[in-house]
Amino acid sequence: MLNKSEMGWVDFSSEDRDRVRDVIKQLSEPGTLDELGIGALRDGFADLMFPGFSTIQTRAKYLITIPRIIRDYLALKPAQQRRQSLQQYLEQQENLLAKALTLQHLNEGVTGIIGSTMKDGESVARLPSSVYWVALRTWGIIDTQASLNQFLRSVKPAESSLGSKLPDEADDTDGVSADSRIHLDRYDPQWIEGVHITLSESEAVFLNHKLQNGPINSLPAQLELSGLLKEVLDEDLTGFAQLAGWVAATPGLAQRTRDTVKMAHSFSELIYGAHLRFNIVVARNNQREDLLDQYELLWCDWHKVPQAGPEQVSQWLAATNISLRGRTGTFLMEWSEHIANSVSVVVLDALVEKQALGNKKERSILKKRLPDNYRWIGMSRLDFRWAQVRTILRDIQEGLPC
């Protein structure tokens, strides 16, 4: 009998594998366990507000360095390309970049350098190109609908640096080259010498322009187009709830964007109550009277505030075009109905417990005895990637001319 589970990959695309890796990573981090199965709706709202961004992105600089590395490869002579594929070159240069940035900012307390903790002889565990590829496509920095692997395979080493075509471009009559699909502020073959994690003025202006011309109803595009980016960054909006309050009070943004933020915040608040009851159930099962008292007080405060009803839940699902797995959609409807009708906590706890067990089955936290010092389990109020987006937008804003 096997004592250890193993995972194998079906080779669909790098995005498919990255999505699974993200899930595995999240399961090892506090506050990300999706015990109630609402992650798809959370991600649906995040994709509307912050398309292309993810929770594992760190700094804006990688939106520049990845296309620079690809452009460097495309500038090589065909003979040099035949000796090394774009995939090999990209991996090599991204590892060199990690070392260069780490040395450049040594002992400066700089955060967000991918690969800064790797030791001699090691490689970056998660290359920036895989982390930022969707963002590069979404914001028009690299013009392609191909996955990262498809794009890398499409640039054949034996071809001219100006002659490589992508799978989705095969029928283009004008023969668009891979080189012309890479957009940058300027070509700088010496860019890696003295590279910094911060953006130059030219790079910041370029990314600022890309955000302005990105998905029109996304929050980054609206903040750029309305001239409100500096204002939102100057505010102490560290959490999504604070951001939602600011957006509600700011008429300069498109109504569709404001509506999306409002719906996302309402969803976060409604489902926070369910996660609160879930933690009360867990605390009761584990005889944690200290946590039980604490969470019951939080519940009393939460329950005083009016929450979204079933009609709003239907609007959320329509707006995000999300189909929730299993009976999660029914659970959301029933939860909102019960809250609107002030149903007893006995019924609420039974509903939450049923959903958790139906979602996770034998893997549910409810089936496990937890350590004596455990704290909050699973999700709390949702952030929708705002923390990561805020850092990247701040990088861009700080690089712009005064």
Regions found by a protein language model. Give the residues of each.
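Non-catalytic recognition/regulatory regions in large multidomain proteins
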Residues: 1-402
